């Protein structure tokens, strides 16, 4: 009677093991599902078998205008759709010549055909009747730009040299113009050529310092006279205290019996600025180049 009792224990032990295995498999599947879901969010692809690959159509995310707003493509598309930017691009590329209507890009054209206006985010402004700036802009008539002719663009101004040109942007070099009364160094020119010792811009001396220019009246400028002592204001002498030979006959012409001693004594002190005074009065002095000099003998009554 004691033998059948041990036979009842193994079925209870096997039932507990079955429940335990089911619970373990359930937990493993749940953990695997959570891992695949997390990896999908990070961008990984999870496949149930090695041969099955997902279709490309399933991999592509649904197109949504609200997603990826800060990407480069979105920024470029917004720039192209702007009318002012499209006009600037057309001018830089040089596609439009003369008068023409600014055409929008292909992306803007297709979107305008579908919705009647390009896709954009609606803006709300307080205190304005218009609900959106972009919507009110699309209601305006097409912008017509009156282009300038090529002759006006390519016609250079006097003194300009084009260095670099791209579209409507040009880099030009303008030569500096100087006035009529200025040198290149910025100093004014001296137009008073009649001043004493002045030089004209041609390099020649003026009438006061040398030869006068042809076709102009000769103007003489008198140099300032130096103050002379009373001892030197006598008859001009040259050649070491002797009188000029041209003055001897005139000095002794009136009184042939007079002696030339006072003249020699007064003139022996040195040369006087008599010739310079003659030049100042317009009469050039004649220097005695001959070796013959008239010297009256001492003690003689006359020559």
UniProtKB/Swiss-Prot annotation:
Point to the regions of Basic and acidic residues compositional bias. Answer: 148-158, 172-188
Its record classes its membrane topology as: Single-pass membrane protein
* Keyword set, alphabetical order: Cell membrane, Membrane, Phosphoprotein, Transmembrane, Transmembrane helix
Q: Where is the composition biased (Gly residues)?
A: 194-212
Q: Which stretches of sequence are listed as region Disordered?
A: 46-67, 111-303
Phosphoserine modified-residue sites: 52
Q: List the Pfam families.
A: RELT
Its localization reads:
Cell membrane
Name of the protein described by the UniProt record: RELT-like protein 2
Native source organism of the sequence: Bos taurus (Bovine)
Could you tell me the gene encoding this protein?
RELL2
């Amino acid at each position: 009677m004691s033998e059948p009792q041990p036979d009842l224990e193994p079925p209870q032990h096997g039932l507990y093991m079955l429940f335990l295995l089911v619970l373990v498999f359930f937990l493993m599947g749940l953990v695997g599902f959570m891992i695949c879901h997390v990896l999908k969010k990070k961008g990984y692809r999870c496949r149930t078998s090695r041969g099955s690959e997902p279709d490309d159509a399933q991999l592509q995310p649904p197109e949504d205008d609200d997603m990826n707003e800060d990407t480069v493509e979105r920024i470029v598309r917004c720039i192209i759709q702007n009318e002012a930017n499209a006009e600037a691009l057309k001018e830089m590329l040089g596609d439009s010549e003369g008068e023409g209507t600014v055409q929008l890009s292909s992306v803007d054209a297709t979107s305008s055909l579908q919705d009647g206006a390009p896709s954009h985010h609606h803006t709300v402004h307080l205190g304005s009747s218009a609900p959106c700036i972009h919507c009110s802009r699309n209601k305006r008539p097409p912008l017509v730009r009156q282009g300038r002719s090529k002759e006006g663009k390519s016609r250079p101004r006097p003194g300009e040299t084009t260095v670099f040109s791209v579209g409507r942007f040009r880099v030009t070099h303008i030569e500096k113009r100087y006035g009529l009364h200025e040198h290149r160094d910025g100093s004014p020119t001296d137009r008073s050529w009649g001043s004493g010792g002045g030089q004209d811009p041609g390099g020649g001396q003026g009438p006061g310092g040398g030869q006068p220019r042809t076709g102009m009246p000769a103007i003489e400028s008198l140099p300032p006279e130096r103050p002379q002592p009373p001892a030197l204001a006598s008859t001009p002498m040259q050649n070491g205290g002797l009188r000029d030979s041209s003055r001897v006959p005139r000095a002794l012409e009136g009184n042939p019996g007079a002696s030339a001693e006072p003249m020699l004594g007064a003139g022996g002190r040195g040369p006087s600025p008599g010739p310079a005074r003659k030049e100042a009065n317009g009469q050039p002095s004649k220097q005695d180049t001959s070796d013959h000099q008239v010297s009256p003998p001492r003690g003689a009554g006359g020559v």
